[in-house]
């Protein structure tokens, strides 16, 4: 069985996923494409030599008889409508973050999927598929160094451009930590606060950088997440879980060490694509394989997208108010409580 994809959005991430499905992964094929810029969509089909039709809009693409699964890589505010259309048509859907730009939008998707009666949606939280995070998750789940007490992590970028506004530090950057930490320690968030140290001289006037986000879980785990998007030295992701009997840390990226002029060092990546390229491959292959094997995706689901949205909204309020914000989630439906094969179980 080949899973036939229709792609909504042919920007940078959309093109990368299309190349991935056509050239690197097994079991998938691009058969339909659409974009607000029709010429761009046609150009992609021509350049990649795809056997795919270009549709005038997302609705017509979703309705196409030869589309089994919809890949949503459109503009963030369009995701909600794209996903709801796919669910209405009974099509599987892989959607890049965010699932929706509001918690209310996420809830609409959750209700639509539950009414359909089976899982159709997977959200593109790719860090769960990163080899290092997978190893860290296994170490945590094995409990061989006790229960988690604290987590320290950092998300550092060399620099950002003028289009990067202050809110993006939460909704575009911290959002990755919000999801992966929720998955790593398997505990619900209770509150969030944000503090701002001295501002770096490299930050543009409109941006507060760096910032430290403190999350507390219902189980009492205290998480500090540094967001520093103008650190200059490289793209650096850190995570350290302090346990009752030891510490588990995210492995460093593989790199040769060098000795030169009385210096011993290693290279640091400058780009997120290099850091997580394999994780993108694994998450989409897992999406394809899960559907072929069980008839449902088993990766990050619509509920995970809702948790991320609620938590990010609270973190943004904390950033702007200077006050701790409590995180109030609706009760998790049993529909999303059934254990599926997780990425780390499939990879280890």
From Swiss-Prot:
Main enzyme class: oxidoreductase
Gene3D superfamilies linked: Dihydrodipicolinate Reductase, domain 2, NAD(P)-binding Rossmann-like Domain
NAD in keyword set: yes
One example GO MF annotation: nucleotide binding
Keywords, alphabetical: NAD, Oxidoreductase
Record Pfam families: GFO_IDH_MocA, GFO_IDH_MocA_C
Catalytically driven reaction(s): myo-inositol + NAD(+) = scyllo-inosose + NADH + H(+); 1D-chiro-inositol + NAD(+) = scyllo-inosine + NADH + H(+)
Domain of life: Bacteria
Pathway(s) it belongs to: Polyol metabolism; myo-inositol degradation into acetyl-CoA; acetyl-CoA from myo-inositol: step 1/7
Enzyme Commission number(s) from the entry: 1.1.1.18, 1.1.1.369
GO annotation, biological process: inositol catabolic process
UniProt cross-references to PANTHER family, sorted A to Z: INOSITOL 2-DEHYDROGENASE, PTHR43593
Function (record text): Involved in the oxidation of myo-inositol (MI) and D-chiro-inositol (DCI) to 2-keto-myo-inositol (2KMI or 2-inosose) and 1-keto-D-chiro-inositol (1KDCI), respectively.
Assembly notes: Homotetramer.
Family to which the UniProt record says this protein belongs: Belongs to the Gfo/Idh/MocA family.
Protein name: Inositol 2-dehydrogenase/D-chiro-inositol 3-dehydrogenase
